[in-house]
Protein backbone atom coordinates (compact mmCIF):
# COMPACT_ATOMS: atom_id res chain seq x y z
CA UNK A 1 0.00 0.00 0.00
CA UNK A 2 2.84 2.40 0.89
CA UNK A 3 4.57 1.87 -2.46
CA UNK A 4 1.34 2.41 -4.40
CA UNK A 5 0.56 5.52 -2.35
CA UNK A 6 4.01 6.94 -3.11
CA UNK A 7 3.60 6.18 -6.83
CA UNK A 8 0.20 7.89 -6.88
CA UNK A 9 1.62 10.93 -5.08
CA UNK A 10 4.50 11.07 -7.57
CA UNK A 11 2.08 10.78 -10.49
CA UNK A 12 -0.03 13.68 -9.19
CA UNK A 13 3.08 15.80 -8.63
CA UNK A 14 4.41 14.97 -12.11
CA UNK A 15 1.08 15.75 -13.81
CA UNK A 16 0.98 19.12 -12.01
CA UNK A 17 4.56 19.87 -13.10
CA UNK A 18 3.73 19.06 -16.74
CA UNK A 19 0.63 21.25 -16.56
CA UNK A 20 2.55 24.20 -15.05
CA UNK A 21 5.38 23.82 -17.57
CA UNK A 22 3.02 23.69 -20.56
CA UNK A 23 0.98 26.66 -19.33
CA UNK A 24 4.08 28.73 -18.56
CA UNK A 25 3.08 29.01 -14.91
CA UNK A 26 6.07 27.19 -13.44
CA UNK A 27 8.35 29.75 -11.84
CA UNK A 28 12.09 29.70 -12.49
CA UNK A 29 14.45 31.27 -9.97
CA UNK A 30 17.73 32.02 -11.69
CA UNK A 31 20.92 32.58 -9.73
CA UNK A 32 24.64 32.03 -10.16
CA UNK A 33 25.45 28.42 -9.30
CA UNK A 34 28.91 26.89 -8.86
CA UNK A 35 28.63 23.71 -10.93
CA UNK A 36 31.37 21.46 -9.56
CA UNK A 37 30.04 21.63 -5.99
CA UNK A 38 26.41 21.45 -7.14
CA UNK A 39 27.09 18.34 -9.27
CA UNK A 40 29.19 16.70 -6.54
CA UNK A 41 26.25 17.16 -4.16
CA UNK A 42 23.90 15.48 -6.66
CA UNK A 43 26.28 12.51 -7.01
CA UNK A 44 26.52 12.20 -3.22
CA UNK A 45 22.72 12.31 -2.90
CA UNK A 46 22.28 9.72 -5.66
CA UNK A 47 24.89 7.39 -4.13
CA UNK A 48 23.25 7.72 -0.72
CA UNK A 49 19.81 6.75 -2.07
CA UNK A 50 20.72 4.11 -4.65
CA UNK A 51 19.50 0.55 -4.24
CA UNK A 52 21.88 -1.10 -6.72
CA UNK A 53 25.62 -1.66 -6.71
CA UNK A 54 26.27 0.51 -9.77
CA UNK A 55 29.13 3.02 -9.58
CA UNK A 56 27.81 6.61 -9.84
CA UNK A 57 30.53 9.20 -10.41
CA UNK A 58 31.32 12.69 -11.60
CA UNK A 59 33.71 13.26 -14.49
CA UNK A 60 34.25 16.91 -15.23
CA UNK A 61 36.74 19.74 -14.95
CA UNK A 62 37.63 20.33 -11.33
CA UNK A 63 37.96 24.09 -11.67
CA UNK A 64 34.89 26.02 -10.51
CA UNK A 65 32.39 27.12 -13.14
CA UNK A 66 29.58 29.56 -12.45
CA UNK A 67 26.36 28.95 -14.41
CA UNK A 68 23.36 31.26 -14.36
CA UNK A 69 20.53 28.79 -13.84
CA UNK A 70 17.65 27.69 -11.68
CA UNK A 71 19.72 25.38 -9.50
CA UNK A 72 16.72 23.45 -8.16
CA UNK A 73 15.36 22.78 -11.66
CA UNK A 74 18.84 21.78 -12.86
CA UNK A 75 19.09 19.41 -9.90
CA UNK A 76 15.62 17.96 -10.70
CA UNK A 77 16.73 17.24 -14.28
CA UNK A 78 20.07 15.66 -13.39
CA UNK A 79 18.73 13.61 -10.46
CA UNK A 80 15.95 12.28 -12.73
CA UNK A 81 18.50 11.25 -15.37
CA UNK A 82 20.78 9.65 -12.75
CA UNK A 83 17.86 7.76 -11.16
CA UNK A 84 16.70 6.52 -14.57
CA UNK A 85 20.22 5.32 -15.31
CA UNK A 86 20.26 3.46 -11.98
CA UNK A 87 17.02 1.65 -12.91
CA UNK A 88 18.59 0.22 -16.07
CA UNK A 89 22.21 -0.32 -15.03
CA UNK A 90 23.08 -3.71 -13.52
CA UNK A 91 25.20 -4.22 -10.42
CA UNK A 92 28.83 -3.56 -11.27
CA UNK A 93 27.87 -1.14 -14.06
CA UNK A 94 28.73 2.54 -14.07
CA UNK A 95 26.93 5.86 -14.42
CA UNK A 96 28.80 9.08 -15.15
CA UNK A 97 27.69 12.71 -14.93
CA UNK A 98 29.78 15.04 -17.06
CA UNK A 99 29.64 18.57 -18.43
CA UNK A 100 31.59 20.58 -20.96
CA UNK A 101 31.40 24.15 -22.21
CA UNK A 102 30.59 24.58 -25.90
CA UNK A 103 31.92 28.12 -26.43
CA UNK A 104 30.92 28.13 -30.09
CA UNK A 105 27.25 27.45 -29.30
CA UNK A 106 27.37 29.42 -26.02
CA UNK A 107 25.99 26.54 -24.02
CA UNK A 108 26.86 24.01 -21.38
CA UNK A 109 26.49 20.37 -22.44
CA UNK A 110 25.59 17.99 -19.62
CA UNK A 111 25.57 14.23 -20.09
CA UNK A 112 24.52 11.23 -18.03
CA UNK A 113 26.07 8.05 -19.42
CA UNK A 114 25.40 4.51 -18.23
CA UNK A 115 26.49 0.98 -19.05
CA UNK A 116 22.94 -0.34 -18.76
CA UNK A 117 20.60 -1.97 -21.23
CA UNK A 118 20.53 0.94 -23.67
CA UNK A 119 17.55 2.17 -25.68
CA UNK A 120 16.74 0.80 -29.13
CA UNK A 121 17.19 3.52 -31.75
CA UNK A 122 13.58 3.25 -32.93
CA UNK A 123 12.36 3.93 -29.36
CA UNK A 124 14.67 6.85 -28.50
CA UNK A 125 12.24 9.66 -29.36
CA UNK A 126 9.40 7.91 -27.51
CA UNK A 127 11.08 8.21 -24.10
CA UNK A 128 10.43 11.97 -24.01
CA UNK A 129 6.67 11.54 -24.50
CA UNK A 130 4.25 11.62 -21.59
CA UNK A 131 3.45 8.31 -19.90
CA UNK A 132 5.89 6.47 -22.15
CA UNK A 133 7.62 3.55 -20.44
CA UNK A 134 9.79 1.17 -22.42
CA UNK A 135 9.85 -1.33 -19.56
CA UNK A 136 6.60 -1.85 -17.64
CA UNK A 137 8.46 -3.75 -14.91
CA UNK A 138 10.47 -0.69 -13.83
CA UNK A 139 8.82 1.67 -11.35
CA UNK A 140 7.99 5.18 -12.47
CA UNK A 141 5.19 7.34 -13.83
CA UNK A 142 6.47 7.66 -17.39
CA UNK A 143 6.56 11.45 -16.97
CA UNK A 144 10.10 12.07 -15.72
CA UNK A 145 11.79 12.50 -19.10
CA UNK A 146 8.84 14.51 -20.45
CA UNK A 147 9.26 16.88 -17.48
CA UNK A 148 13.02 17.03 -18.10
CA UNK A 149 12.47 17.93 -21.75
CA UNK A 150 9.85 20.61 -21.01
CA UNK A 151 11.99 22.11 -18.23
CA UNK A 152 15.13 22.16 -20.35
CA UNK A 153 13.26 23.76 -23.25
CA UNK A 154 11.82 26.44 -20.93
CA UNK A 155 15.40 27.12 -19.79
CA UNK A 156 16.44 27.61 -23.44
CA UNK A 157 18.12 24.24 -24.03
CA UNK A 158 17.33 20.86 -25.53
CA UNK A 159 17.78 17.17 -24.61
CA UNK A 160 18.56 14.14 -26.75
CA UNK A 161 19.99 10.65 -26.67
CA UNK A 162 23.49 10.22 -28.13
CA UNK A 163 22.83 7.79 -30.99
CA UNK A 164 26.56 7.08 -31.37
CA UNK A 165 26.96 5.66 -27.85
CA UNK A 166 26.39 1.89 -27.93
CA UNK A 167 27.50 0.66 -24.46
CA UNK A 168 24.27 1.59 -22.67
CA UNK A 169 22.58 4.98 -22.90
CA UNK A 170 23.87 8.56 -22.93
CA UNK A 171 21.43 11.41 -22.37
CA UNK A 172 22.78 14.84 -23.30
CA UNK A 173 21.19 18.22 -22.66
CA UNK A 174 22.22 21.77 -23.43
CA UNK A 175 21.87 24.79 -21.16
CA UNK A 176 22.56 28.34 -22.39
CA UNK A 177 25.44 30.14 -20.71
CA UNK A 178 25.40 33.77 -19.72
CA UNK A 179 28.51 35.78 -19.04
CA UNK A 180 28.83 37.51 -15.71
CA UNK A 181 29.07 41.29 -15.92
CA UNK A 182 32.70 41.12 -14.77
CA UNK A 183 33.52 38.80 -17.73
CA UNK A 184 31.86 41.05 -20.33
CA UNK A 185 34.27 43.96 -19.79
Identify the meaning behind each predicted range.
Residues 3-8:
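Short alpha-helical segment of the dimerization/phosphotransfer core of two-component systems
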Residues 19-30:
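Helix-loop junction within the histidine kinase core
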Residues 29-44, 75:
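A conserved beta-strand-to-alpha-helix junction within the catalytic ATP-binding
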Residues 49-58:
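Short conserved segments within the C-terminal catalytic ATPase subdomain
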Residues 119-131:
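Short conserved segment of the HATPase_c
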Residues 144, 148:
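Short alpha-helical Gxxx[C/S/T] motif in the catalytic ATP-binding
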Amino acid sequence: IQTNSNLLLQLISDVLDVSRLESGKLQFNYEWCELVTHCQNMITLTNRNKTTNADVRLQMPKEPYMLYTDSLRLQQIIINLLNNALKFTPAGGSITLDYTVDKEKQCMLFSVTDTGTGIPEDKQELVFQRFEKLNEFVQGTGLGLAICKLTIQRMGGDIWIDKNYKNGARFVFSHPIKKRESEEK
